[in-house]
Amino acid sequence: MIMKLKKILSALIAGVMMFSLAACVNQHPEETSNPVNTESLRLVATSPAVAQICNRLNLDLVGVCQTSGVLPERYKDLTKVGMAMNPDLEILKSLNPDYVLSPNSLQSDLQPKYASISVNALFLNLKSVEGMYASIEGLGKKFDREKEAAAMLAEFDSFMQEYKDKNVGKESPKVLVLMGLPGSYIVATESSYVGNLVKLAGGTNVYGDGDGEEFLTANTEDMKSKEPDIILRAAHALPDQVKEMFAEEFETNDIWKHFAAVQNGKVYDLDSSLFNMSANFSYSDALEALQPMLYGEE
């Protein structure tokens, strides 16, 4: 039986997000639909993905998250406010921000913390590419960056039209997506970012949208009953260790040998730099990488 993992996101996700100004979540909902004066605006981005969006929108920040990943050059020397999952509230408060921009996957944990230091927060959704562009559109309206947002939306629409055109008429493969952590793995549904990419690529997730849950845990017998054509293996963290774990699991657990996807050589390890936990501007490269996996084409 599948068990929904209602609390797993706070343990797994470093930064994923939904934001459209019409449906933005913050401590003061009555304020979100009104544009703000950007001349003296003080913003803090608490995840790398949010910082990338702010950079593309040409927004200045006063603080940014600590990360081992890449931050836009313009933000590298800013005050660091800690990791995405656990920002330093004392540092945040000292920056006197007008808004703190954070992932809505962490809203249940972060919103009461932000409220405790009386800072406004906007929670964004990067669980899907569409959510990311809704976020961009909303931020553009709120922070007087509609021109920049419109250019990015046009870029997205153009890419997706061209991408989908080349798959017209092709049969949709059934796909099982596994998300690995060192020592364990779970199922990623199409409600997760990796699952969303598979859906955009034209694949059919054998676990659907998980009734809105990004991740499920299921036994291998249940997975086998779904008869996936393709198995994709992604890593939440420590990709080298996870890849070794998956290799050992598929080699030593006899049931995998009975999956048609395994028998047909349709098991693929995803590049963790493209297939991570939150939507970002590498989605186009990720979709191109999926093309030969799903359709056997280069």
Where are these regions (language model features)?
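Structured C-terminal subdomain patch of bacterial secreted/periplasmic proteins
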Residues: 41, 131-137, 141-144, 150, ...
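Alpha-helical, coiled-coil/dimerization segments enriched in small aliphatic residues
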Residues: 68-74, 186-215
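A short, structured surface patch at a secondary-structure boundary
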Residues: 44-95, 99-105, 206
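Basic- and aromatic-lined ligand-binding clefts that recognize polyanionic substrates
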Residues: 40-57, 148-202
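Bacterial N-terminal signal peptides that target proteins for export
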Residues: 2-12
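Bacterial signal peptide processing site
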Residues: 25-28
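Proline-aspartate-enriched helix->loop->beta-strand connector
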Residues: 88-102, 119, 219-233
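C-terminal motif of bacterial Sec signal peptides marking the signal peptidase cleavage site
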Residues: 20-23
